[in-house]
Design a protein with these regions (language model features):
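Secondary-structure boundary/capping signal
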Residues: 24, 75, 178-179
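Generic structural motif
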Residues: 3, 126-130, 178-180
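C-terminal non-catalytic interaction appendages of large macromolecular assemblies
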Residues: 136-141, 146-150, 154-200
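Amphipathic interaction/junction segments at domain boundaries or subunit interfaces
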Residues: 55, 66-155, 159
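N-terminal, charged low-complexity regulatory/assembly segments
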Residues: 1-67
Length: 200
């Protein structure tokens, strides 16, 4: 069965074709083999965790490692950061456009409460500590995160910052009355991610 392409694998192939045409085939094969190995090693993870592993974490690791065959490590990191950033900017644009609907911004913290519980919960490898989830406020400390844990496990903790940054790009400045705040993240070396989205 053919594996579904993620935005990361698509962007990786584009980089290989445009920047390293002579090595593109070899790089694509190396990427596919590494991703297959990573998926096999993590096959026992829960369905909830697989959602994050398959969509972002493992393709990110495979792309980062494979790019280092053709460019310096720091450049490979910036390249993957660019992939993640591009998706985050698109997502920001779509969300901001949606929030032009009068009053819709008020619902955002509540949506974050629901999605944290369903997609970013214990079953997916996260450990959210809810501090405030009502009255237009979503305030959660994330004590454990599979993005951070998996990147660290595979020897590339620095890659996690790409995903941390993507949150800030996606959610900062969505609406004048909606405030996104986070001063710490596990991926940037802190002991938690202190998430907050509130209506002001």
């Amino acid at each position: 069965m053919k594996r579904k392409e993620t935005y990361l694998s698509r962007d990786f192939r584009e980089t290989a074709a445009l920047r390293f045409p002579a090595q593109a085939k070899e790089l694509n094969t190396a990427f596919d083999m590494r991703l297959s190995a990573l998926l096999a090693e993590n096959a026992g993870a829960s369905k909830e965790k697989q959602y994050h592993l398959k969509r972002q974490i493992l393709p990110g690791i495979a792309a980062y490692e494979t790019l280092q065959r053709a460019m310096p490590k720091e450049e490979a990191l910036q390249t993957v950061h660019g992939y993640v950033e591009r998706l985050a900017r698109t997502s920001h644009k779509q969300l901001a456009a949606l929030l032009h609907i009068p009053g819709l911004y008020r619902l955002v913290p509540g949506v974050f409460v629901k999605s944290t519980r369903s997609v970013f919960g214990l079953a997916a490898g996260f450990a959210p500590k809810e501090l405030q989830t009502g009255n237009g406020v979503w305030r959660v400390d994330m004590m454990k995160c599979p993005y951070h844990d998996t990147c660290a496990e595979y020897g590339c903790p620095e890659l996690c910052r790409c995903f941390c940054d993507s949150d800030d790009i996606s959610y900062t400045g969505l609406h004048p009355k909606l405030i996104w705040e986070r001063s710490m993240t596990l991926g940037r070396g802190n002991d938690r991610c202190d998430f907050c989205m509130e209506v002001r």
